[in-house]
């Protein structure tokens, strides 16, 4: 498994905790590859990374955004499977081990799991599947974040993240899903998502939110352009996802232009 960790402005303690959560898994050095893509951070964490493991692949590049940082990681990935992790998050060992067992013992292209805002998580149930990614999208609400997916590298082909935008996951993830022929999914919470003030998804600057909405609109346009070229089943799945994202966009526009307390009361 190639673990692609993107790093920009996260506190070093969080990055080290992230890497340690990968090292804690039941994978030996030949079964894992840890890639840290430094997207132009003010301080290089290379010394701290070497102290954790001498086998970490570290690359530092000028700030180009999360999408391009992940693309860099993809080009360096040597594992059969890929797992993306943001540098301030971490994997929850017991639940993630279930995902590893699935790729070890079953023929699968992708394992979907849940995220948690708590660091402790225990496996709750067996995974369901296999089904196709198309079938999953047709009957389930898809989480945008690609970080809750462990997937086979070869299904990517030429698929990459869009560069220089927010909402890069919303464009990338549904296209990735359509490429998965054998998918397992579980409600187990294997990914700890840290809600941190100052992180990219918790900014309060109005200009940032306006840019976020503009980028989301462009993502919708680009996904819609691809629909006409898809086979019938894939088209139905993608149209359902576009409808979900459109409703999210409408809600977020209303939130930005109206009083949020009043909006939540009405809803």
Where are these regions (language model features)?
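A conserved acidic beta->alpha catalytic loop
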Residues: 35-46
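Short hydrophobic beta-strand elements that form part
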Residues: 2-6, 35-36, 60
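Donor-binding/catalytic cores of nucleotide-activated saccharide
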Residues: 6, 66-67, 86-184, 194-210
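Short aromatic/hydrophobic "clamp" motif used to bind/position activated sugar donors
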Residues: 82
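Glycine-rich, basic loop-to-helix element that forms the pyrophosphate-binding segment
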Residues: 61-77
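C-terminal subregions of glycosyltransferases and related glycan-biosynthesis enzymes
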Residues: 194-267
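Short, well-formed alpha-helical segments that are part of the catalytic scaffolds
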Residues: 10-24
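Cell-envelope/extracellular polymer assembly enzymes that use nucleotide-activated donors
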Residues: 1-2, 21, 33, 171
């Amino acid at each position: 498994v190639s673990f692609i960790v993107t790093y920009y402005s996260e506190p070093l303690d969080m990055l080290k905790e992230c890497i340690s959560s990968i090292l804690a898994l039941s994978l030996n050095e030949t079964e894992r590859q840890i890639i840290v893509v430094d997207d132009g951070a003010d301080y290089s964490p290379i010394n701290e990374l070497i102290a954790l493991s001498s086998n970490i692949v570290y690359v530092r590049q000028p700030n180009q955004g999360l999408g391009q940082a992940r693309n860099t990681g993809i080009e360096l990935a040597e594992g059969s499977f890929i797992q993306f992790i943001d540098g301030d998050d971490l994997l929850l060992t017991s639940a993630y081990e279930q995902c590893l067992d699935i790729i070890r013992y079953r023929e699968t292209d992708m394992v979907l799991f849940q995220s948690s805002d708590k660091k402790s998580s225990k496996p709750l149930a067996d995974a369901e599947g296999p089904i196709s990614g198309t079938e999953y999208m047709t009957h389930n609400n898809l989480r945008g974040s690609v970080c809750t997916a462990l997937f086979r590298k070869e299904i990517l082909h030429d698929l990459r993240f869009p560069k220089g935008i927010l909402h890069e996951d919303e464009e990338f993830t549904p296209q990735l899903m359509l490429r998965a022929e054998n998918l397992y999914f579980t409600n187990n919470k294997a990914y700890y998502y840290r809600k941190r003030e100052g992180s990219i998804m918790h900014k309060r600057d109005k200009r940032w939110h306006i840019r976020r909405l503009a980028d989301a609109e462009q993502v919708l346009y680009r996904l819609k352009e691809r629909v006409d070229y898809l086979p019938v089943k894939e088209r139905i799945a993608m149209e359902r996802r576009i409808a979900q994202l459109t409703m999210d966009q409408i809600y977020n526009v209303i939130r930005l232009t109206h009083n949020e307390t009043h909006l939540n009361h009405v809803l």
